[in-house]
Amino acid sequence: MGDEDWEAEILKPHVSSYVPVFEKDKYSSGANGDTFNRTSASSSEMEDGPSGRDHFMRSGFSSGRNLGNRDIGESSKRETTSTTGGFGRGKGFGNRGFLNNKFEEGDSSGFWKESTNDCEDTQTRSRGFSKRGGYPDGNDSEASGPFRRGGRDSEYDQDQGSQRGGGLFGSRKPAASDSGSGDTFQSRSGNARGAYKGLNEEVVTGSGKNSWKSEAEGGESSDIQGPKVTYIPPPPPEDEDSIFAHYQTGINFDKYDTILVEVSGHDAPPAILTFEEANLCQTLNNNIAKAGYTKLTPVQKYSIPIVLAGRDLMACAQTGSGKTAAFLLPILAHMMRDGITASRFKELQEPECIIVAPTRELINQIYLEARKFSFGTCVRAVVIYGGTQFGHSIRQIVQGCNILCATPGRLMDIIGKEKIGLKQVKYLVLDEADRMLDMGFGPEMKKLISCPGMPSKEQRQTLLFSATFPEEIQRLAGEFLKSNYLFVAVGQVGGACRDVQQSILQVGPVFKKRKLVEILRNIGDERPMVFVETKKKADFIATFLCQEKISTTSIHGDREQREREQALGDFRCGKCPVLVATSVAARGLDIENVQHVINFNLPSTIDEYVHRIGRTGRCGNTGRAISFFDTESDNHLAQPLVKVLSDAQQDVPAWLEEIAFSSYAPPSFSNSTRGAVFASFDTRKNFQGKNTLNTAGISSAQAPNPVDDESWD
């Protein structure tokens, strides 16, 4: 067909006799509201990446998930105009298609109208016409360029001056605005639910225009905007029994009394031995008793009086040792004593305490603890995090917010939109502070403390808690803490919990899957977590285990928040007794009865290894950690692993010692980013007092590297 014939075909009124058959549930989430189950895909699909969807090849019909931009027709450098039904103005064709499952005004194409309670954004892109078809702006009938769909390329049209961005799968660069006609074509670049760019970002998808936007950059209110994230998490249980459901302590809980604790800094207050010595109010004491707390852990004995005294604190204690209660209880005691300012009757909420953690699951866990200890008081805790509806976060805040628990991206987004005030902030808490201050979230945390209205570090109390504090992180902490802050070191700082039996197995890459199946079948009904390094690998291993008749689910940053919460729920209740995870689940998560941790892939740093195996052996319970050591990729961890195993009084394999001290292993005390010495004591040189710690662990000499393939927020 020549150019003239093609133009005439477009411009003439046309009534197609073709009636597409839409499989209503083919790409939808289903009647029950469940989203796609990633573990049900074939192993070949998980290993090779997402496959292209079948699409209609007639006059702009396509499936709900196109893969980019591709010219239809013989010429890509010619302006066309549409004035009749079918093309443009969102009527059947074009970038609008179906909007909220109903037709635009004046549409008469005869398709059904559908209503659904499913909140997922898939409903606007998986039914009806493609949003990638036709012109990019349904209100501009003069838009330049032919109808484009499919494909994966990007080109710049010199004749028309318009830029069309296609982008490969997972493209991290949004199409730039053009310098000519003002039309920007943007590719969907793969499916919408697997499209996290990086640390704090979420996908903004919509009618013909997509954009990668960070929450901190206003990703939910961009000029180029599609359907917002609509997931609203279910409310937590309100009955008292559920609120105060507590973790069962293990047989080794009493051994905490023998752990060495050192406090460095000026004029540290003495430790307390019982909750009664803290002089907390009666309501707090009642809530502590209901939660099943009878004895203080070492970090609580020293941290509670320090926080009550108003001192800044950096506390380093092993995983599962009660750090959350160590900062929540004294903060609540202060708020109960001094009174609160925020209430639901104020137009602008100004929380007194802000708690920040790197992952959604961890911050929700902290919120539940805050809700537990504040039960029956006038203090109201609120949690906000990415992957949930932005309006839902605002509604939670305006109802009253005294303690704000947040992930960094959503917190900066809320602050940027002036939904909260910071003038009343008295307490700033960074949980998993080493991760909060490293390359992943360091810039955002610096923005937070420099926000207008945020009290200076001299006017607020700042608390940093983690299981690991490398020396570089301690230096960065100087920007957040007063110069006279106190440093609490509990036990072997940066070391692994001795309640965890560690085993290192030398397993090559091709044998790992079969070895994993063998271990899982031998442990019977015990509940294991399997850690891998990448999101793709997590889904692949989960699929493989399901094929081996082992019920498995997965959690990682590319799964929608609804799916992440469902996966954790299925794992907790035993519906899926095996959880395959990336570093999203490595820090802080407190899941009862996790008896095994299996490192299918070892992490890049020893600090991350300590956090991973800390998911078991919590609160005095015993656990086991099995790690697959690959001599082709894990040699940099040989020396730090030997040190961690020795400090935890674990058996060290002879072959591992050989690798650690061979000439092929990196030197132990170097400035390399892997396997160097990390600080196991207060690194300040100018404080008055004696630091008696004389043990040195081995870890990264600098901040832990952010996990390249993981979305933390």
Curated annotation (Swiss-Prot):
Residues that bear Phosphoserine: S207, S211, S711
Q: Where is the Helicase C-terminal domain?
A: 515-660
Q: Specify the Helicase ATP-binding domain's residue ranges.
A: 304-487
Q: Read off the PROSITE patterns from this record.
A: DEAD_ATP_HELICASE, HELICASE_ATP_BIND_1, HELICASE_CTER, Q_MOTIF
Q: In which tissues is it expressed?
A: Testis.
Which Pfam family name is an example for this entry? Helicase_C
Q: Name the residue ranges of motif: DEAD box.
A: 431-434
Where is the segment annotated Disordered? Answer: 23-240, 689-713
Q: Name one GO biological process term.
A: regulation of protein localization
Keyword set, alphabetical order: ATP-binding, Cytoplasm, Developmental protein, Differentiation, Helicase, Hydrolase, Meiosis, Nucleotide-binding, Phosphoprotein, Repeat, RNA-mediated gene silencing, Spermatogenesis
Which segments carry the region annotation Interaction with RANBP9?
Answer: 213-232
State the reactions this protein catalyses: ATP + H2O = ADP + phosphate + H(+)
- Cellular compartment(s): Cytoplasm; Cytoplasm, Perinuclear region
InterPro entries cross-referenced by the UniProt entry: DEAD/DEAH_box_helicase_dom (IPR011545), Helicase_ATP-bd (IPR014001), Helicase_C-like (IPR001650), P-loop_NTPase (IPR027417), RNA-helicase_DEAD-box_CS (IPR000629), RNA_helicase_DEAD_Q_motif (IPR014014)
| Motif position, Q motif | 273-301
The main place the protein resides is cytoplasm
**The organism's place on the tree of life at top rank:** Eukaryota
Q: What does this protein do?
A: ATP-dependent RNA helicase required during spermatogenesis to repress transposable elements and preventing their mobilization, which is essential for the germline integrity. Acts via the piRNA metabolic process, which mediates the repression of transposable elements during meiosis by forming complexes composed of piRNAs and Piwi proteins and governs the methylation and subsequent repression of transposons. Involved in the secondary piRNAs metabolic process, the production of piRNAs in fetal male germ cells through a ping-pong amplification cycle.
Q: What binding partners and quaternary form does the record give?
A: Found in a mRNP complex, at least composed of TDRD1, TDRD6, TDRD7 and DDX4. Interacts with RANBP9. Interacts with RANBP10. Interacts with PIWIL2 and MAEL. Interacts with BMAL1 and CLOCK. Interacts with Tex19.1 and, probably, Tex19.2. Interacts with RBM46.
Family membership noted in the UniProt record: Belongs to the DEAD box helicase family. DDX4/VASA subfamily.
* Protein's recorded name: Probable ATP-dependent RNA helicase DDX4
Gene for this chain: Ddx4
